[in-house]
């Protein structure tokens, strides 16, 4: 990706148009100020791009996270005539890059924690444990049963089941998933996930921000998800508790010049 100030950097033009600040290749420990998914999905990570500003009157943040994970597979076995037995070959390790484009909007009032993320395979979690891929949420726990709204794709966790089911409905997850393309009408986002945490609406997908249309769509999805929140959620004591777990966006220590 080109740097700001050079021709052909649409995301820099996008940031300038909205008055957002941006920083390239920032230290990954900036994410330590943002607990929970998706900022800590994998232990090995880098941050190629970070942006912050206001969107529709709300504090906003956009971050491209580049995770890397190791995949180990056993080597093939062969018969050794000298040993008179089958021998296992050396295991093979490959590296996989996982792109995560994330936007955050901060609402005026908090709501309880709710995470709608990809449903993971238990055997995959165990294999990932041996490869030291995850340092947090190493094994995905039991989720909230939202019935057909999960599409057998999403894992839902957080506060009360009643709250989760009020937000996560079959029509909404079908819209969000859209046969794996995501809900954007003008680009393919892939699988889209979200999290409500105190005042924060966090939305992420497997795209970076080379094409600013990804940013526009993720921010639009965040606004749509805000409309899904039932009024009772703002009165729930769990809302204030979730809000205490994170730093307000304007108070984050961000590496802007």
Put a short name on every predicted segment.
Residues 1-14:
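Transmembrane-cytosolic junction motif
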Residues 11-257:
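Charged, low-complexity intrinsically disordered regions
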């Amino acid at each position: 990706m080109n740097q700001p100030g050079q021709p052909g950097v649409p995301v820099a033009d996008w940031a300038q148009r909205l008055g957002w600040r941006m920083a390239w290749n920032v230290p990954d420990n900036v994410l330590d100020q943002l607990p929970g998914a998706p900022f800590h999905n994998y232990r090995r990570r880098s941050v190629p791009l970070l942006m912050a500003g206001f969107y529709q009157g709300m504090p906003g943040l956009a971050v491209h996270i580049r995770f890397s994970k190791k995949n180990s597979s056993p080597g093939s076995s062969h018969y050794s005539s000298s040993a008179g037995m089958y021998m296992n070959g050396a295991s093979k390790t490959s590296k996989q890059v996982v792109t995560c484009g994330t936007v955050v909007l901060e609402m005026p009032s908090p709501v309880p924690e709710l995470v709608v993320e990809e449903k993971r395979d238990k055997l995959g979690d165990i294999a990932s444990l041996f490869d030291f891929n995850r340092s947090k949420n190493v094994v995905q726990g039991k989720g909230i049963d939202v019935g057909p709204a999960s599409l057998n794709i999403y894992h839902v966790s957080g506060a009360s089941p009643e709250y989760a089911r009020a937000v996560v409905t079959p029509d909404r997850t079908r819209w969000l998933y859209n046969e794996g393309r995501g809900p954007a009408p003008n680009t393919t986002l892939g699988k889209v996930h979200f999290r409500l945490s105190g005042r924060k609406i966090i939305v992420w997908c497997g795209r970076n921000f080379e094409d600013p249309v990804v940013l526009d769509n993720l921010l639009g999805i965040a606004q749509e998800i805000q409309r899904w929140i039932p009024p009772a959620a703002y009165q729930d004591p769990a809302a204030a508790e979730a809000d205490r777990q994170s730093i307000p966006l304007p108070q984050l220590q961000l590496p802007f010049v």
